């Protein structure tokens, strides 16, 4: 995933249109949102106002930075929708050489709609492998296409899709993606299957993926169809649905390529992945600072993502324990423990690595044993976890949400957000100050007048085309800053208002101080309880990994492995059903798979 290429002063529309990869959103389609959906989540939260977690806790950076995938992550909701609506999927074309170079086509039939995922594969030198947006070569390049792919379209895709940003698409193309093979494991897996062996769990058990994606584009980029182009009953008329269908099939390609190359190398001796391994690998992904501007520029989207989680958590916390519920929760705790116990002991600072989560889960199991037979046991378990710290509380949140049985039709609707807002220039200074105190009173806790609060500014690098933080004492912005300094802008706006007459219209303030226009616009747009992380992106203490992890968890990613303070690697769809397994008996308990334990010769 990569950065939104937006600069300071861009309109909200431009910010949405220019946003890259999985961050591409759907806000351009406001006119198509059902009339009740814009306020539906707020109504649901209001009905639970005495039970939901306050924003003062839920939006703390350390809490967001401990989030884990849940039942309402986008990967999970996509597959549940596929099962509920009777989707079928499979491979319809494969033309690869012995090294896995060539083309493959998968199809998904979703009711009356058919979609094709067309992938072109090659090999490049290991030195050319990079997760950066400036890469110009990839081993895998694919496109999700509306309908079947005829010869003419396939010929065009062969030219345009491998070009990615340099290519040009049309509205038949719904999503564009690319990536590379795992340098460490692809060849090893081919060799083992070619020799008639399953992989050695000690060699690849903590790998988690065969291919690693580096971007998913959609929503009108390069001429593709925009979210506004989907009618209301379209299967992809849900945020991120098209991208996650593409990601699921991208993951399938990894299995198919390895098994094809193994057969080419081993002939009759070759075997495919057995039952223990055939779901274990997911799709790798790497993400950097590009996630941060997206989260900071879309407060209502962030509110929806957090609000859905908080709504479901509130329901479970007050739930009466059914006879089988306790056993179900114990099963999820045990499953999580087994999954993380077989993971790595790598340094994942500032997060806990897999091995460190094992004693945490042992404590959770013990705590559940103490409260299970008492009054309001789910609430008691959560309150205990909150006192243990964010890593424990958010692990327990993820586990408790597995007990929630919300209506997916409703939840799909709740993720649709109307981001339009407009400021009233006749509003008085007193009215604006009251709104600022109500919505951003927490800014006073951030020491925003101190020098460390304004140490950095954000810029899109000329060399890498990615967001970077620059030291203000070493490089002046000169109008190139990416406007993610929300806390500072609103704080300074408030300071200016202190010197103005209470009855003065805010338009007069902006006439004298036009630099505060964006602050006023943000104040108006930030009208939801969960829209603002309680943090300052320009401070020396700011840790981008925290908001990144929250966003990745909402996507459905796990196995967070930071490489520094600004970027990390993750895994998606690990344990998920394969294309051929999709059917009415497909269950939603595929997450947290156990590492295969045997190596059959």
What are these regions (language model features)?
Residues 82, 162-169, 176-187, 191-243, ...:
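Non-transmembrane, interaction-prone alpha-helical and coil segments associated with secretion
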Residues 29, 38, 71, 75-80, ...:
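Ampiphathic alpha-helical segments that act as solvent-exposed interaction surfaces
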Residues 105, 595-601:
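Secondary-structure-rich domain cores
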Residues 29-81:
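Terminal, regulation- and interaction-focused segments at domain boundaries
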Residues 271-573:
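Long, charged low-complexity terminal regions
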